[in-house]
Structure formats: structure tokens, C-alpha cells
Amino acid sequence: MQSKFIVIEGLDGAGKSTAISFVRKYLEKNNLAAIYTREPGGTKIAEELRNLVLHNKYDEEIHSDSELLMIYAGRVQHYRNLIAPALEKGINVVSDRFYWSSMAYQGGGRGVELSKIRALNDNFLNGCEPDLVIYLDIDPILGLQRAQKVGSPDRIEKAGLEFFNRTRKVFKDLVKDLDNAIEIDAAKSIQEVEKQIYLILDKHFNFQN
């Protein structure tokens, strides 16, 4: 079976980590080897860039274009040093976020032109597209409430409600436009979300469990 690149997307507080635990459980049950990773981050250099973007300790503004380029510098490291080699070896890759998050957060939220983001993807990631994107949709107010229970808000989580409304809109537009994406209502119970994820994976891997 050809290796798969699966991405979990959604606003902060949507439950991506929980969803990934369900994907892990499913793949392990079906004896499918996989690595689990995240963005921003995924490699040592990418994690350093993540820390700079989310927890800027310097008395200097990070401009929207700079934020995008730092995230993409980390993404190139992540893709070339971890994602692509694993897929070439026949190992499935499951990632908490990928380039959709840049389209939504930097494009929708910050207002960076989406064409710039697509160009970065085409030029530096060979136009890489996940085999499957599971988008967890949640109202930004509920998502931020959930995120605040986990810990102190990071730099992006402090961006405000309108920022997240714009971000959500781009996520939902992407789901409508792409055949490899499925939306789940993340406000539903954990049990219902788990059930839906298993059904999606059954169909994707052509399994009948």
C-alpha cells in the first residue's frame, strides 16, 4: 500500500491533538506504520522558528510577510528532512497542520495575498498536497475558550476574534474547493468526532472494520 500524507487542520482549540490520537489508534490497529509531527515545527530548526513566531521575545514587530516566510522556512525544513523522506520509505505521515494553516492564518487572518502562499508551496515544496485533510471546524469563540484552558495564549492566539473569523472562512473555502478534504463539526462530542474520523479513514484506506 502506498504511503499516505494525512493532515489535521483547524483553529486553535478545535481538538487537533485529540483527533491525531484517534488517527494513531486507527493506524496502529491496522498495522500501518506512521510518524506523527506538527507545524510550525517538526524538526529542530523548524521548532526554533516556531518558538520565534509564537513567542517573540524581542522588542521588534514581526510583519505579516516575515511571519509567513519564517513559517515557510520551517516548513521547507520539515518537508524535505522529515515528510518527504518518510513517504519515500513507505511510511505514512500524520501532521498537525500543513500549508492550509498558512493559507488560513497568514492569508485570511493577516491578509497576505493567497497567491504569494501558493507560490511558496509550488516553488519550495514541489506543490506537495496531502492525500487527506481532515478539517475540524469550530466557532472561534468556543475554540479560544478551549485553548485558554490549556495554557497562556501565544502570539497568534492573541490576534483577536475578527482575525479568527477571517481564518475560519479561508479554511471552510478550502474544504469546498478541494476533493481531498473533509470537514468535521468539532463542537460535537469526542465520541462522535472519533466515530467520524474512523469512518473517513475506513473510506480513505478502503478498509471495512
UniProtKB/Swiss-Prot annotation:
Keywords: ATP-binding, Kinase, Nucleotide biosynthesis, Nucleotide-binding, Transferase. One of its GO terms (molecular function) is ATP binding. SUPFAM superfamilies: P-loop containing nucleoside triphosphate hydrolases (SSF52540). ATP binds at residues 10-17. PROSITE patterns: THYMIDYLATE_KINASE. GO terms for cellular component: cytosol. It catalyses: dTMP + ATP = dTDP + ADP. It comes from the Bacteria. The keyword Cell inner membrane does not apply. It holds the Pfam family Thymidylate_kin. GO terms for biological process: dTDP biosynthetic process; dTTP biosynthetic process; dUDP biosynthetic process. Phosphorylation of dTMP to form dTDP in both de novo and salvage pathways of dTTP synthesis. This is Thymidylate kinase. It comes from Francisella tularensis subsp. holarctica (strain LVS). The lineage of its organism: Bacteria, Pseudomonadati, Pseudomonadota, Gammaproteobacteria, Thiotrichales.
